[in-house]
């Protein structure tokens, strides 16, 4: 035993050194709606691959501008499919890397139980002062919210009540803090264990807005980064898929 122990320790050390040598860090721009899922995925990704994931969260439109201005992101998880496609057309993306990692769900939510009914009729009642949405110019969930209000014929009525967050996280914060009685949020922000975790919500029917297809790409700065390729592969795997679905997304 005394002669085998040093050999075992050396083998473990060699394995650790080998893993560290092959490990990389990947800088990821993450659409705000995907904050909780990517945090859960990152833990498993880092444990399973040895790579490190460093995430920044924000609005898709703002990330587009930052990427065009040379931001050091290597992977982009967008809240739509049009922005990654545009970056691809403009030569900012590793060819063939674009894919849909999730299909988002829009929800009308209030932290107050019973406030939002199952059919969204509360929107027609107008019995509230403020309705929160994400900026429709930069945030796909905000655009989906405006499309839904248009389809319902409520855009003119609800317009004066709108408060806009820079992204879907800020739209959620306006509601959770009480600055708005209700708001359009990503289902992933309020969903846990297969149900709405707190308050009351209406899942907005998909026919009221364009599909929220969320695409990912490897950006040119991640072309030679092993961690960037590993992350994209991981997002396509069964473990990530299960986590993504657990937050209310479709695949």
From Swiss-Prot:
Keyword set, alphabetical order: Metal-binding, Molybdenum, Periplasm, Signal, Transport, Tungsten
Gene Ontology biological process terms in this record: molybdate ion transport
Major localisation: periplasm
GO MF term list: metal ion binding; molybdate ion binding
InterPro entries noted in UniProt: AvModA-like_subst-bd, ModA, ModA/WtpA
Signal peptide (from-to): 1-23
Effect of inactivating the gene: Deletion of the gene reduces cellular molybdate concentrations and results in inhibition of anaerobic growth and nitrate reduction.
Disulfide cysteine pairs (residue numbers): none
Keyword Transport (UniProt): yes
Residues involved in molybdate binding: 60, 168
Keyword Hydrolase in annotation: no
Compartment(s) of residence: Periplasm
Organism superkingdom: Bacteria
Gene Ontology annotations for the cellular component aspect, listed alphabetically: periplasmic space
Function, in words: Part of the ABC transporter complex ModABC involved in the transport of molybdenum into the cell. Binds tungstate and molybdate. Can also bind chromate, with lower affinity. Plays an essential role in recruitment of molybdate for nitrate reduction.
Family of this protein: Belongs to the bacterial solute-binding protein ModA family.
Subunit: The complex is composed of two ATP-binding proteins (ModC), two transmembrane proteins (ModB) and a solute-binding protein (ModA).
PANTHER family (alphabetical): MOLYBDATE-BINDING PERIPLASMIC PROTEIN, TUNGSTATE_MOLYBDATE_CHROMATE-BINDING PROTEIN MODA
Identification of the protein by name: Tungstate/molybdate/chromate-binding protein ModA
């Amino acid at each position: 035993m005394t002669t085998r122990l040093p050999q075992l320790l050396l083998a473990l050390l060699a394995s650790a050194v080998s893993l560290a040598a092959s490990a990389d860090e990947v800088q990821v721009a993450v659409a705000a709606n995907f904050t909780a899922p990517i945090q859960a995925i990152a833990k498993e990704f880092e444990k399973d691959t040895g790579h490190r994931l460093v995430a920044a969260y924000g609005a898709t439109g703002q990330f587009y501008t930052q990427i065009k201005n040379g931001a050091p992101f290597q992977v982009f998880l967008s809240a739509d499919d049009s922005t990654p496609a545009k970056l691809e057309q403009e030569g900012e993306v590793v060819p063939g890397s674009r894919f849909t990692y999730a299909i988002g769900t829009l929800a009308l939510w209030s932290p107050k139980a019973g406030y939002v009914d199952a059919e969204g009729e509360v929107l027609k009642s107008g019995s509230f002062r403020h309705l929160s949405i994400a900026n429709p110019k930069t945030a796909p969930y905000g655009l989906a919210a405006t499309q839904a209000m248009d389809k319902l014929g409520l855009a003119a009525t609800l317009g004066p009540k709108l408060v806009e967050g820079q992204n879907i996280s800020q739209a959620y914060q306006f509601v959770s803090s009480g600055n708005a009685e209700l708001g359009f949020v990503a289902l992933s922000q309020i969903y846990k264990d297969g149900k709405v975790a707190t308050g009351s919500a209406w899942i907005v029917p998909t026919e009221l807005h364009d599909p929220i297809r969320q695409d990912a790409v490897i950006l040119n700065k991640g072309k030679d980064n092993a961690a960037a390729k590993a992350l994209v592969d991981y997002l396509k795997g069964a473990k990530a898929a299960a986590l993504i679905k657990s937050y209310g997304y479709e695949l």
